């Protein structure tokens, strides 16, 4: 499988040296053009038809990418990323993922994987400890990060998580209207379990590790009642928890941030441990099998 590492650090250096009014088009047409197919798949045009309309600039800001007008924050983050050799770390992690997938005969429905590493807004990803990713369209992976001592060592893990989405979505279809809570639990639980398989428990993300036993059990009890609830906006209430639900206009469900991610991870881990199944085997299974046989839910 071919790997294309977009040279985003070089692109950022040029972008931050430009006049402010020119930066958005450089971000749009130079940095995001290689990922146009990815953005189109999630209904985000590179350029809105109307002034100030919804497009890749607006979507990126909403998702927590750095506003390209903020050169001061961007240059500071870029310096840390370069000094930390993050490009090399990212490429090494991706090649480990590809090697594992090919060895286990797990497929990605794409001729190549394009990877882009971007700078995150220093204020918008506090719940995620300053880093995030997207791998929902096979062939494309984005990670955006405001580098700090917590997230820099976890870059391989989030890359593995997003890579697994590329794999999983090569085996199943994802439809916003019909996805259920149970489906989404398994998608995220498998991805974080894959990250654990490759890079260990110590690099798991805060969406899994911040839960103590009491909060986790409460989240399991709440989610147990809604496993068959469908539709992305409804499902998001349970996956992302109240802080993000409030921020994005969803009705809160009484859950901590990323409750569904934590429950999904523990459901997949329980299933794999009880049935002595590897992550590669679990990846090929349907969500209903994992949910009904994980032992966490009274289905």
Swiss-Prot record:
Pfam families membership: DUF2268 (PF10026)
InterPro entries in the cross-refs: DUF2268
Name recorded for this polypeptide: Uncharacterized protein YjfC
Originating species: Bacillus subtilis (strain 168)
């Amino acid at each position: 499988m071919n790997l294309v590492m977009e040279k985003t650090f070089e692109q950022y250096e040029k972008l931050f040296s430009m006049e402010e009014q020119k930066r958005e088009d450089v971000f749009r047409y130079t940095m995001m053009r290689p990922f146009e197919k990815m953005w189109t798949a999630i209904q985000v045009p590179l350029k809105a038809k109307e002034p100030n309309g919804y497009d890749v600039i607006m979507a990126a800001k909403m998702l927590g990418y750095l506003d390209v007008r903020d050169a001061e924050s961007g240059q500071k983050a870029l310096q840390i990323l370069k000094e930390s050799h993050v490009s090399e770390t990212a490429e090494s992690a991706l090649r480990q993922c590809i090697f594992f997938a090919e060895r286990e005969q797990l497929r990605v429905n794409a001729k190549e994987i394009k990877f882009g590493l971007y700078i995150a807004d220093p204020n918008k990803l506090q719940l995620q400890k300053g880093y995030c990713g997207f791998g929902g369209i096979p062939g494309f992976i984005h990670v955006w990060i405001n580098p700090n001592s917590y997230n820099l060592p976890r870059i391989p893990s989030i890359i593995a998580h997003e890579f697994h989405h590329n794999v999983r979505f090569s085996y199943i279809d994802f439809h916003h209207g019909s996805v259920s809570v149970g489906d989404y639990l398994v998608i995220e639980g498998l991805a974080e379990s894959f990250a654990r398989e490759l890079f260990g428990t110590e690099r798991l993300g805060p969406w899994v590790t911040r839960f103590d036993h009491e909060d986790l059990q409460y989240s399991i009890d709440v989610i147990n009642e809604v496993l068959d609830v469908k539709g992305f906006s409804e499902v998001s209430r349970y996956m992302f928890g109240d802080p993000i639900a409030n921020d994005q206009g969803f009705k809160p469900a009484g859950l901590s941030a990323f409750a569904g991610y934590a429950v999904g991870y523990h459901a997949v881990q329980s299933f794999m441990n009880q049935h002595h199944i590897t992550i590669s085997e679990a990846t090929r299974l349907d969500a209903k099998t994992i949910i009904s046989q994980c032992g966490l839910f009274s289905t």
